[in-house]
C-alpha cells in the first residue's frame, strides 16, 4: 500500500518549491492542490484563478476526495494542500493509517505583505494559521512542522530533517529542478508560481519580513498566536 504525505501550507510559504523538491524523487508522485475547486465552491472566496480552476477541476466533495487515493503504481503520493482547503471536509477523509502530515508555516510579517499583492483584503480564513493549528492537534505525532524561515535559510538541513521525520531516504535530487515548471502545476500557476518557475533549485537565503499595514494589525496578531504555537513543534535543523 502506498504511503501518503499530505502537505498543509499557508500562502506565500514556499509550498510550491517544496512540492518541486518531492517531484524530483523517483519514488514519489505529486498532486498540486487537489482540493482547491471544492474549497472555492464551498467557501465562495475570490481568487484570481477562480473561474479557471472551477472549469478545470470538479468541485464536488466525492470527486475531490477521490483524487487523494493513491494509484496502484504509487510508492509515495505527495499531496500539496493549502491548510484552509480542509474547509467543509471531515478529517477522517483526509487521514489514514499510511498518512503522514507536514505543516509548512511562516511568520505573518512575511506572509501578509506578500499575500496582499494578490488579495487586497486578506482574512483569517485566507491565511490558514487556524487550520494549521487544528491539523497539528488532529494529526498529533504523525505531523511534522517546518517553518519557511528554516526551509529557505537551510534547505539541505531542513529537507534532510523532514525526510528523517517521514522515514524517507534522503535524496540530493530534491535540491534542484529544471527551470520553467512541472506537468503537475495547477492552472493557477501563472498567478502565483513565477518565482519557482524562474529558479533551478534551493539557494540558502534569509526570508525578509515586511511591514504589516496598521489596518491589518489585529489580523496579524491573531495569526501570530497560532504561528508561535506551531513554531514550538518545528523540526530542529
Which positions does each model-derived feature cover?
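Positions that flank functional sites
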Residues: 37-38, 151, 177-178
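A structural signal for well-ordered alpha-helical scaffolds and beta->alpha junctions
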Residues: 15, 58-62, 75, 125, ...
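PAPS-dependent sulfotransferases, especially Golgi type II membrane carbohydrate sulfotransferases
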Residues: 1-5, 171-237
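Generic structural signal for helix capping and beta-alpha/helix-loop junctions
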Residues: 38-40, 111, 180
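PAPS-dependent sulfotransferase catalytic core
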Residues: 1-73
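Alpha-helix-centered segments that form part of catalytic cores
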Residues: 68-79, 85
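Short, basic, helix/turn surface patches
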Residues: 56-64, 133-136, 197-205
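PAPS-dependent sulfotransferase catalytic domain
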Residues: 79-173, 187, 193-196
Amino acid at each position: 500500500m502506498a504511503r501518503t504525505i499530505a502537505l498543509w501550507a499557508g500562502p506565500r510559504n514556499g509550498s510550491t518549491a517544496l512540492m518541486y523538491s518531492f517531484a524530483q524523487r523517483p519514488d514519489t508522485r505529486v498532486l498540486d492542490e487537489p482540493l482547491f475547486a471544492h474549497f472555492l465552491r464551498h467557501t465562495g472566496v475570490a481568487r484570481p484563478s477562480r473561474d479557471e480552476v472551477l472549469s478545470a477541476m470538479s468541485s464536488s466533495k466525492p470527486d475531490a476526495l477521490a483524487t487523494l487515493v493513491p494509484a496502484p503504481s504509487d510508492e509515495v503520493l505527495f499531496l500539496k494542500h493549502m491548510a484552509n482547503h480542509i474547509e467543509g471536509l471531515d478529517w477522517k477523509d483526509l487521514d489514514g493509517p499510511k498518512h503522514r502530515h507536514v505543516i509548512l508555516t511562516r511568520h505573518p510579517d512575511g506572509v501578509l505583505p506578500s499575500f496582499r499583492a494578490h488579495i487586497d483584503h486578506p482574512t483569517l480564513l485566507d491565511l490558514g494559521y487556524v487550520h494549521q493549528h487544528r491539523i497539528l492537534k488532529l494529526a498529533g505525532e504523525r505531523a511534522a512542522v517546518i517553518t519557511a524561515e528554516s526551509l529557505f535559510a537551510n534547505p539541505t538541513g531542513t529537507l534532510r530533517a523532514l525526510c528523517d521525520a517521514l522515514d524517507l531516504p534522503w535524496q540530493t535530487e530534491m535540491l534542484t529542478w529544471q527551470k520553467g515548471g512541472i506537468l503537475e502545476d495547477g492552472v493557477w500557476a501563472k498567478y502565483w508560481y513565477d518565482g519557482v518557475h524562474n529558479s533551478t533549485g534551493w539557494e540558502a537565503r534569509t526570508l525578509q519580513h515586511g511591514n504589516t499595514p496598521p489596518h491589518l494589525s489585529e489580523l496579524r496578531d491573531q495569526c501570530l498566536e497560532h504561528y508561535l504555537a506551531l513554531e514550538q513543534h518545528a523540526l530542529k535543523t
